[in-house]
Amino acid sequence: MSNLLQSIPEGRIDFAGQKLVDTISKIVLITAVVISFIAGFALQDIRVTFGLFGASTALLSLVVLPPWPMFNQHPVKWLDSKGNGKEKAS
Amino acid sequence: MHSIFSRINNVSALLSSCTMALLAAIALSTLVFNADPKGDLAIASIKVYPGTTRRYAKTKQDLAFVNFNITADLTPLFHWNTKQLFLYLEAEYINAQGVKNDVVIWDRIVRRKEDANINVAGKNKYNFRELSASFKNVPPANYSLKYNVMPYVGYLTYGEIAKTVEPVAFPRSQPRV
Amino acid sequence: MFTEEIKAFRRLGFRHVLLQALNFATVIASGLMIWKGLGIITNSESPIVVVLSGSMEPAFYRGDLLFLTNPVSEQYKTGDITVYKIPGADIPIVHRVLETHDVPPKGRKAKEAGEPASQLMLTKGDNNYVDDLELYQGLQWLERKHIVGKVRGFLPYVGYVTIAMNDFPQLKYALLGVLGLLALLQRE
């Protein structure tokens, strides 16, 4: 099964990208809740609330889920394998 | 957040907590609206005829026929979390055996604010019969119009719109002409 | 195909597998505890139910979630929406109370003991034209003992997952299988 999973493109992003995604989704979702609640309450229409919330969720997943290049600008730089080749004798 | 699967997982976890919070906020916001509109209810006439019902097809029994007038403005009950109103007219009486009876004789579902200005001259929708099959010696009954607000999300509320000032007596059973 | 998984198991070690199993059991046990605890608080054998039929439309649609209570001290009133289960019927029914008749306890002894009136009820679905007599399977009236609870709160659509699982059993097994595999193979 893991072979199967590995064959699907996983859309990996780097560590800085992960942090960015985390922050973006938190901010967007919480503001979406607050704004859609206030808008719906002000207009006295619950459809406004769920429309706004649904739209912002769709937009968020479009921004956050695909591995856009902006989430891959800080690739991990591994050290050369040469220097680590020697093992210290104890 | 490394792969797309873990991102979907994390975002949907956050999304479900946010949705829960939003739904809870909507349910709680209903507390602000505590309109309790009143209206008028008048019983125009009551007749009692012998008849049969599906339930007791073979027993001889009395059925009461009630004509009533209702006027009420229920638009204040419609707020952003009101899905529909359920209106019902019920008769309450305690018969000679001490049985307390509540019988719904008419109801209506109101789904839009535009339809919430109620002005009905109607008669009972449902069979109105006594447990003992006869309205003889049954004390006068009170009639009241009640509502149930059903929300999109949250809890159900109930209230009373109107009640007859004095109990209305049942007339003698008369043969149907 | 499963050689990888077996390898993963070996690498994780026996203790780790046990720990995962324990985690899994904790999740199930706490779920059961919450359910039973709610049942005690609300005095209802199933405090949350999913609407299975359309007989209360447009109030409740299939898949809506209802929260019930069944207070001991309270009598049911007309207009209350109740969930009841007739002995012999497989599924509970959600319908509105149309008539109540509180018959006082018979005999002076029972009266002095302050026994509550036994309540006879008749229900009807908002979307049905006639009352529920035919659903009662030969009973004339609904009684307190048949009633699971009174609807207090409402959450739309959420229960649709369970209906989907009932309609398509494959979905249920697929979901259970995937969840089980994930729980066992997750490496934290």
Swiss-Prot record, chain C:
Keyword Transferase in record: no
Lumenal compartment spans: 42-188
CDD domains named among the record's database cross-references: S26_SPase_I
Membrane topology listed for this record: Single-pass type II membrane protein
An example molecular function term from Gene Ontology annotations: serine-type endopeptidase activity
Main location (coarse class): endoplasmic reticulum
GO (cellular component) term, any one: signal peptidase complex
GO terms, biological process: signal peptide processing
EC primary class: hydrolase
EC number: 3.4.21.89
Places the protein is found: Endoplasmic reticulum membrane
Subunit text: Component of the signal peptidase complex (SPC) composed of a catalytic subunit SEC11 and three accessory subunits SPC1, SPC2 and SPC3. The complex induces a local thinning of the ER membrane which is used to measure the length of the signal peptide (SP) h-region of protein substrates. This ensures the selectivity of the complex towards h-regions shorter than 18-20 amino acids. SPC associates with the translocon complex.
Domain notes per entry: The C-terminal short (CTS) helix is essential for catalytic activity. It may be accommodated as a transmembrane helix in the thinned membrane environment of the complex, similarly to the signal peptide in the complex substrates.
Protein name (record): Signal peptidase complex catalytic subunit SEC11
